[in-house]
Amino acid sequence: MAVNVDLQTDATLQVDISDALSERDKVKFTVHTKSTLPNFKQNEFSVVRQHEEFIWLHDSFVENEEYAGYIIPPAPPRPDFDASREKLQKLGEGEGSMTKEEFTKMKQELEAEYLAIFKKTVAMHEVFLCRVAAHPVLRKDLNFHVFLEYNQDLSVRGKNKKERLEDFFKNVVKSADGVLVAGVKDVDDFFEHEKTFLLEYHNRVKEASAKSDRKIRSHKSKFLLSLSYLYGFFLKVSELFEKTRKIEARVAADEDLKLADLLKYYLRESQAAKDLLYRRGRALVDYENANKALDKARAKNKDVLQAETTQQVCCQKFEKISESAKQELIDFKTRRVAAFRKNLVELAELELKHAKGNLQLLQSCLGVLKGDT
C-alpha cells in the first residue's frame, strides 16, 4: 500500500480492492468485503465501484451532522492517466522514426510508469475504505454498507457546473467563517493547542509536499535529460549512463511512493482534522451566542422557553462533538507519527541501497576507463 496509515484491523469487517480495470475515461474497482457482522446478508462478497461512488460516500459522511465530531477520512484523488496515455500515443506515432529496440525499450518504460500510477490510484482508494472500515462509528454507517453490498450501479454522477459553483461559494463562506471561528479562544486548552498545532502542521506538510514533487520531477527529467545528451558523446560510458538512469528512475519511484504520497495523504487528512476543529469552533460560537440570547430573553421575560430550547440544543451539539473530537485527534497523532516513521525509515534504506548501487557502477566504470579490467 502506498500510504501506511497504521490501521487497526478488525476481523469482523475487512475491506480491500481485489481487482481494478482501467478503461479510457474511468477506472472500475472491485471492492471485496469479508464480514461476520449481522448487518450483511453474506460473509463474503464483492461489488464494482467507480471513483464518483467513492466521492459520494465521502460526501455523505461530511454532510451528516451525526459525524461532526469525527475526522472524516480524506477522499481519494481522482484517477489521472492522461499524461501517461499521451506519451504512449506519441510513442506510437513516432514508431517509424526509431529502431525496434529503442521502441520496445521506450514502450516498456512508459507501460511501467502507467502501471505505477494505476497501482497508486488503487492503493489510495483502498486506504479510504480501510480507514472507514476501521473506524468504530463510520463503519456502521448505512451508506457505507450500501456501498459495500449493493451489487448494482449506485447511479451516482459527478457534480455539474452549477453544483461545483455552489461548492465554491460554500467554501468561500466557510473560509470567511473560519477566520471568525479561529479568532475565538477555546474554552478547552487541549483543543486550543490542537488548533494552533494543526494550522502550522498543515502548512508545513503542504510546503514539504510541493518541494517533494519538485525533487521527484528533477530526478525524472533534468538528470535523465543530461544523460541523454551525454549518451551520444561518451560511448565508452553509455552502459554506465543507462544503468544509472534506471537507478535514478527507481529512486524517483521510491520517493514518490514513500514520501510524496505520504505527504499528499496527510495534507488531506490534516485538512480533515482542521475541518473537525472548525465544526467544533462553530458549535462553540453558536453555544455562546445561545447563552447570550437566553440571558436577553430572561431579562426581557420574552420567548424564554424558545431560547432555553435553542441553548440546550447548542449545548448538546457542542458537548457531543467535543466528546468524540478529543479521541479522534489523539488517534490522528498516533497514526501519523507511526506512518511517517515507517515510510521515512524505509525510504532511507532504499536510498542507501540505490546510492551503493550507483557507487559500484561508477567504480566499475572508472576501472574500465583506466584499463584495470
Language-model features: locations:
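Phox homology (PX) phosphoinositide-binding domain
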Residues: 1-200, 204-207
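C-terminal, extended alpha-helical scaffolding domains
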Residues: 160-373
